[in-house]
C-alpha cells in the first residue's frame, strides 16, 4: 500500500510567476499546504516487471476531501490518455500523486512530470536538453548492469533498456534536440541563449523539450500548451500523436485531445472512468452509455414500483402474504446486487457579462502607432499601426511568441504608451482585461466572498447578493468562504471573470483566458462572449474557442498587423506546413555547425 502523501516532498515543486517577497512567502505557504495535504492508498495488481500499470482500490484525499474512492488506475504502455474533469476535481493533485509515487508504481517505470521550468544557469537551452539526455544514458547504463546481474540477459526490463539506449544515440543529440526546440518556438539563435537569460515561459519550454527528448516510460503533461504560441501548439500536437510510450495529458483543448489521445480518463464523482478513442469518441460514447443507463434505471424503478404495489395489495390473506414475501425477496436481491443509479450530471455554470451602453464608433483608434520597449529604433515591436475597434469587434490576435500580442493589449489599456503616434479612446470606454498573471491580484489569504466584497466596497449589496454574484461564476457553497490560496487555478480564473463582469465593461481583452478552465467552462465563456453586446479581443492558443467567438483573425508579425483572409482552420493548416519546414531547416542547420 502507498504511504501518506507529503512525507517525501523534495521533488514536489510548482512554478509561480515573479512576485514580491511578501507574496512569495504567501505563495510558498499555500504551495507547501497543497503538497502536504494529500493522502493516497492503492494496491498494485499488475506484474512488477510489466510496463503496464494497474493499481486497484485507489483512494486519494486532499485537505480531507475525497477526490478518488475505491477506483482503479490503469495505464497501458503505448497508450496516450487525456485526463479530463471539472475544475477542482483533483486532476493536478492526481498527477502529483503519480509523480512522487505515493501510489505503488514499479521503480523501473521512470516518470517525468512537467511541473517546473528548467533551472536558470550558464548552460544554453540546447546544452540543457543534451545534458539531461547524457544523464539519462548514464542512468540506463547503470540500470543495464544491475538488471544483467540480478535478472539475467532474458529480463523483460532489460529489453526496454536496450531499446531506450538505442534511441539515445549521442551522435544524433544535437540535430534531434534542435528539431524539438525549434518545434517549441526557439530559433537557431535563441536556443543558444543561456537559460538564466530566458523568461520563465521559455524555460518551461526547455523543460518540455527535455521530456520529449528522453521519452520517459510515463510522461505526465499538465496543460503543456499553456506556454506555447499557436505554431508550437500544432507542432506539439503532431509530435505527441506519435509518442510510443505511456502518456497522460491534462488539457482544456478539445482539438489537442482529439489529435493526440488514444484513450480518455474521466475523473468524475470520485472515480476514474475509462473510454477508448479521442475526445469526440468519449463525448459520443458517454452520451450513449448515459441514455442506456437511464433506460435501465427507469425500467428497474418501474419494476420495483410494480412489485411494491402488489405487496401493498396483499392485505392479510395468508396465501397472498406468502406471495408478497416472495416478491420482497426479489427487491432484496436487486438491492444486494446493486440498483441501477440515475445518471448524475456534472454541474455546469453558465456565466455572462452584463449589458453595456452604446458608444459611438470607433471606441478605440490607433493612429500611426509605433512602439518599442526601449524607445530605440532597433527594438521597434510595432511600426505605423493604424487600427480601429468598435463595439461589434470580435478579433483573435495570432502570431508567434514575441510578436507583440500581449503588448498590443497593454497599449490598449494604457499600461504602456506608444513611442510614436496616438491611441484615441472614447471618453466613456470601460475595459476589462484577463491576462496570464491575473491571479496575482488575488489575496490568497482572503476568502472569495471577502475579497470580491472589498474590491467593490462602493456597491450597495448585502451578503446574499454577493454570494449570488460569485456563485454565477461557479464559486459556490463552502468554496466562497475558504482561503483562495487553497483553491485550484481553475476556480481562481472563475473569480477573475467575476471581477471583470462587475467592472461592467464595453470591451473585453482576453489574453489566454482558457489556461486553467475545464471544457464546460470554456464553452460557457464562449456563450458569454457571443451574448455580450460589447467588443472582444482575444489572444488564445485554443483553436476551438477562436472558431467559436472570433469574426476576424489578425496576424501579429514582422512589426505590423495584417488581417488573415481565411478562418482559423485555414490558419492552423498554414502553421502546420510552416512548422514542418522550420524544424527540417533547423535540424539541417544544426548538422552543419
UniProtKB/Swiss-Prot annotation:
Molecular function terms from GO: ATP binding; ATP hydrolysis activity
Positions bound to ATP 1: 85-92
InterPro entries, A to Z: AAA+_ATPase, ABC_tran_Xtn, ABC_transporter-like_ATP-bd, ABC_transporter-like_CS, ABCF_EF3_subfamily, P-loop_NTPase
Membrane-spanning intervals of the chain: none
Binding site for ATP 2: 399-406
A Pfam family recorded for this sequence: ABC_tran
The keyword Nucleotide-binding is annotated on this UniProt entry: yes
Domain of life according to the entry: Eukaryota
Domain ABC transporter intervals: 53-294, 364-583
Family per similarity comment: Belongs to the ABC transporter superfamily. ABCF family. EF3 subfamily.
Name of this protein: ABC transporter F family member 2
Organism: Dictyostelium discoideum (Social amoeba)
Amino acid at each position: 500500500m502507498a504511504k501518506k502523501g507529503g512525507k517525501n516532498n523534495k521533488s514536489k515543486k510548482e512554478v509561480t510567476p515573479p512576485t514580491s517577497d511578501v507574496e512569495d512567502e504567501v505563495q510558498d505557504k499555500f504551495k507547501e499546504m497543497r503538497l502536504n495535504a494529500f493522502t493516497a492508498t492503492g494496491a498494485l495488481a499488475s506484474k512488477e516487471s510489466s510496463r503496464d500499470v494497474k493499481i486497484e482500490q485507489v483512494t486519494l484525499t486532499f485537505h480531507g476531501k475525497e477526490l478518488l474512492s475505491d477506483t482503479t488506475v490503469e495505464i497501458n504502455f503505448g497508450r496516450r490518455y487525456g485526463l479530463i474533469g471539472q475544475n477542482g476535481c483533483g486532476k493536478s493533485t492526481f498527477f502529483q500523486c503519480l509523480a512522487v509515487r505515493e501510489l505503488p508504481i514499479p521503480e523501473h517505470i521512470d516518470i517525468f512530470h512537467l511541473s517546473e521550468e528548467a533551472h536558470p544557469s550558464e548552460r544554453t537551452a540546447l546544452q540543457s536538453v543534451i545534458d539531461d539526455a547524457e544523464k539519462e544514458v548514464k542512468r540506463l547504463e547503470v540500470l543495464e548492469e544491475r538488471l544483467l546481474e540480478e535478472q539475467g540477459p532474458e529480463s523483460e526490463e532489460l529489453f526496454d533498456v536496450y531499446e531506450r539506449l538505442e534511441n539515445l544515440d549521442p551522435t544524433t543529440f544535437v540535430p534531434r534536440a534542435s528539431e524539438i526546440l525549434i518545434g517549441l518556438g526557439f530559433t537557431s539563435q535563441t536556443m543558444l541563449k543561456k537559460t538564466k537569460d530566458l523568461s520563465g515561459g521559455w524555460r518551461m519550454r526547455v523543460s518540455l523539450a527535455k521530456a520529449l527528448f528522453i521519452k520517459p516510460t510515463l510522461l505526465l503533461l499538465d496543460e503543456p500548451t499553456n506556454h506555447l504560441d499557436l505554431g508550437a501548439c500544432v507542432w506539439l500536437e503532431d509530435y505527441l500523436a506519435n509518442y510510443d510510450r505511456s502518456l497522460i495529458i491534462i488539457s482544456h483543448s478539445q482539438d489537442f485531445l482529439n489529435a493526440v489521445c488514444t484513450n480518455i480518463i474521466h475523473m468524475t464523482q470520485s472515480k476514474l472512468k475509462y473510454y477508448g478513442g479521442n475526445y469526440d469518441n468519449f463525448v459520443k460514447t458517454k452520451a450513449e452509455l448515459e441514455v442506456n443507463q437511464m433506460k435501465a434505471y427507469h425500467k428497474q424503478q418501474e419494476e420495483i414500483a410494480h412489485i411494491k404495489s402488489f405487496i401493498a395489495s396483499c392485505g392479510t390473506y395468508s396465501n397472498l402474504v406468502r406471495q408478497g414475501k416472495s416478491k420482497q425477496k426479489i427487491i432484496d436481491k436487486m438491492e444486494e446486487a446493486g440498483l441501477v443509479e440515475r445518471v448524475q450530471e456534472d454541474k455546469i455554470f453558465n456565466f455572462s457579462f452584463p449589458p453595456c451602453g452604446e458608444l459611438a464608433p470607433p471606441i478605440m483608434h490607433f493612429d500611426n502607432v509605433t512602439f518599442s520597449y526601449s524607445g530605440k529604433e532597433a527594438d521597434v515591436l510595432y511600426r505605423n499601426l493604424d487600427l480601429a475597434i468598435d463595439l461589434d469587434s470580435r478579433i483573435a490576435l495570432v502570431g508567434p511568441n514575441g510578436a507583440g500580442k500581449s503588448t498590443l493589449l497593454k497599449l490598449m489599456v494604457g499600461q504602456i504608451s506608444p513611442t510614436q503616434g496616438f491611441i484615441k479612446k472614447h471618453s466613456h470606454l470601460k475595459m476589462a482585461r484577463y491576462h496570464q498573471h491575473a491571479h496575482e491580484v488575488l489575496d490568497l489569504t482572503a476568502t472569495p466572498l471577502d475579497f470580491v466584497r472589498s474590491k467593490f466596497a462602493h456597491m450597495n449589496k448585502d451578503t446574499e447578493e454577493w454570494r449570488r454574484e460569485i456563485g454565477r461564476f461557479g464559486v459556490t457553497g463552502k468554496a466562497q468562504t475558504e482561503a483562495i490560496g487553497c483553491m485550484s487555478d481553475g476556480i481562481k480564473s472563475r473569480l477573475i471573470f467575476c471581477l471583470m463582469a462587475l467592472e461592467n465593461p464595453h470591451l473585453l481583452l482576453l489574453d489566454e483566458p482558457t489556461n486553467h478552465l475545464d471544457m464546460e467552462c470554456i464553452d460557457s465563456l464562449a456563450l458569454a462572449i457571443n451574448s455580450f453586446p460589447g467588443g472582444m479581443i482575444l489572444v488564445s492558443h485554443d483553436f476551438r474557442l477562436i472558431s467559436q467567438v472570433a469574426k476576424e483573425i489578425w496576424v501579429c508579425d514582422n512589426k505590423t498587423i495584417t488581417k488573415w483572409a481565411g478562418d482559423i482552420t485555414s490558419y492552423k493548416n498554414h502553421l502546420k506546413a510552416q512548422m514542418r519546414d522550420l524544424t527540417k531547416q533547423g535540424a539541417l542547420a544544426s548538422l552543419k555547425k
